[in-house]
């Protein structure tokens, strides 16, 4: 029985980390009808190809948003950084499919569904400050409008290009599209296979500027957002989900 190696691991964004799912196990359970992605996929997303593969009897896995999580830690910088806050941005709405026998996976994150500074995630990140509700709302608004330009670029996309390694530890090469720019990177993964699903987790650090994103800065840079952000992810996908 072949340990399903080719799948994915991110974002970011984003992401990113989403990439992970590609590592689905090829020793899949019986093929069941494939449910459509919830919430609407982006234009051009190859959902039809995955659904056709499932109809042909091939093992196709769908990402389970309720069991998946992508978290991005955004940290402050500048001479007056102590007056600002670090932030945690999360997606609970990762969508997409994995086709293990082709070593293929395509994932997406809707940026307008990102949430900011959930208390539990702030605690996990070790952030001790507690921004007010107004500060959180302002951070989210600035992120979507000024930083990510979410109306113009509403999705972050991940496409798996290959997976290397055996056993629990793998490395996925993925193309991430964010803010209209596509970058390819290697993402380390930890893979846990189960009877009817797989969980893939990992983390990476990337520069916002690599995607043409300009981190927010005020007071001449005295308070600003660091260019580098840390992304950690846990992606679960199952057959016929």
Question: Positions of the model-derived regions?
Answer:
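Bacterial N-terminal signal peptides
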Residues: 12-25
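Long, low-complexity, intrinsically disordered N-terminal extensions of eukaryotic proteins, enriched
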Residues: 2-3, 22, 30
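Bacterial N-terminal signal peptides that target proteins for export
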Residues: 2-14
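Low-complexity, acidic/polar, glycine-enriched regions of mature
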Residues: 26-241
């Amino acid at each position: 029985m072949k340990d399903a190696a080719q799948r994915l691991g991110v974002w970011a964004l984003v992401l990113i980390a989403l990439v992970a799912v590609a590592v689905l196990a090829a020793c899949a359970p019986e093929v069941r009808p494939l449910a459509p992605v919830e919430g609407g996929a982006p234009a051009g997303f190859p959902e039809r190809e995955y659904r056709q593969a499932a109809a042909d009897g091939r093992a196709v896995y769908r990402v389970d948003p309720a069991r998946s999580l992508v978290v991005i830690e955004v940290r402050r910088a500048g001479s007056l950084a102590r007056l600002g806050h670090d932030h945690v941005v999360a997606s609970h709405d990762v969508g997409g499919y994995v086709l293990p026998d082709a070593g293929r996976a395509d994932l997406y994150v809707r940026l307008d569904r990102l949430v900011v500074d959930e208390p539990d995630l702030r605690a996990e990140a070790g952030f001790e400050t507690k921004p007010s509700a107004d500060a959180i709302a302002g951070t989210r608004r600035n992120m979507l409008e000024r930083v990510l330009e979410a109306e113009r670029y509403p999705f972050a996309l991940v496409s798996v290009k290959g997976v290397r390694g055996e056993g629990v530890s793998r490395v996925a090469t993925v193309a991430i599209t964010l803010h209209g720019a596509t970058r390819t990177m290697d993402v380390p993964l930890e893979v846990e296979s189960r009877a009817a699903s797989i969980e893939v987790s990992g983390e990476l650090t990337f520069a916002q500027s690599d995607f043409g994103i300009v981190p927010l800065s005020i007071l001449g840079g005295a308070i600003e957002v660091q260019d580098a952000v840390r992304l950690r992810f846990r992606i679960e996908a199952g057959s016929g989900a």
